[in-house]
Amino acid sequence: KGNKDKKKKNNKDTNKGNNRISIPENWLNDTAEWSYQNTESGIYGIHSTWKPMLDEATKSLKVIHAGVKLGSIKGKDLIPDQSLALCTELHQDTFPKAELSYEDAIQYLRKEAITLPDSLPRGYVLVTYRGIPLGWMKNLGNRANNLYPQEWKIKSSHIPEGNNNLITW
């Protein structure tokens, strides 16, 4: 009897995770200038200027990376990618934003927990410092998950005094 139950569990509907999620064309500026591709590793946008070159390259080469990774699908969620946050073509008004202070921005870049304002809706929030996107947080209401890439986090606990120039041009 136990083996039959295991077999039934293993015969779950494999199409369950293949629900088609629409590609969010409003995430980038000038949407008519972008082509979108849904792959196993995520959803990518490539500017139409480079699309013919990519198509030609894929005929004879293994393309490792092309375009901007917009996000990845996890269950029914489309999780925005860090590269989207850093893309100069990001349409920032599409997402709720949280402007961070210098101290909060450093905490975010250390991948530490920060508190988001109660006025923000649940879901993915673009965090910015002086109007420049740093990345994403997922607002769960009572707390927020820091989605900054683990391998990019600041490991030093030292905060320079007197210089609050996190971003300089």
Predicted regions and their residues:
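Polybasic, low-complexity RNA-engagement segments
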Residues: 1-169
